[in-house]
Amino acid sequence: MLILISPAKTLDYQSPLATTRYTQPELLDHSQQLIQQARQLSAPQISRLMGISDKLADLNATRFHDWQPHFTPDNARQAILAFKGDVYTGLQAETFNDADFDFAQQHLRMLSGLYGVLRPLDLMQPYRLEMGIRLENPRGKDLYQFWGDIITDKLNEALEAQGDRVVVNLASEEYFKSVKPKKLNAELIKPVFLDEKNGKFKVVSFYAKKARGLMSRFIIENRLTKPEQLIAFDREGYFFDEETSTQDELVFKRYEQ
């Protein structure tokens, strides 16, 4: 079983590390090509392209400039411990033990605009380059054209290595669009998280993101390997709703608190 999640805009390079183990990202040659493109942008261009403030644009122009292909624990941090958005609040990787990191390294992948695919312990230098950004590059007009089949091929390698054909898609639409489902050698399962609001169940972005992290942690902690095991997920009040679920879309609901 391979779990896919999105990266986060918020990064943490300060907190104590939960592990000193690390690996190197596998697609750095491609990342370097994107960095070369990004370095051609001025801070005002970055601001317009990403829709961010001048201050953030300056920070990211500096990050692109400072980025170097030789990753060490001094200039980089394990991806699963560097990302700090809502998904990662649910995941709480900072509390993983060695066995959790082992399982996650084999079964969890983070999709990334700059790095393509990251394993949890892959070192990562700080960046901001969302998958949906229209950064022109030698391969096309955006990052989807840049990555092409590369991300899908890397996921197929991971599936082959673990010997099964199940992908649990906990990534956002923006990021999963970088994967080619028809070329993926796997059964695709998408958990959906609905929260009750004024008597109706709907996707509430903040809660849904955190729930994706909670589900990822549930799979990792319990060493789940079969799709049917996912329906036992019951963290923070969620329950499986068989009536509205299908074989490839598992619906989890939570009543208003």
UniProtKB/Swiss-Prot annotation:
It comes from the Bacteria. It holds the Pfam family H2O2_YaaD. GO terms for cellular component: cytosol. Disulfide bonds: none annotated. InterPro entries: YaaA. GO terms for biological process: response to hydroperoxide. NCBIfam families: PRK02101.1-1, PRK02101.1-3. Belongs to the UPF0246 family. This is UPF0246 protein YaaA. The lineage of its organism: Bacteria, Pseudomonadati, Pseudomonadota, Gammaproteobacteria, Enterobacterales.
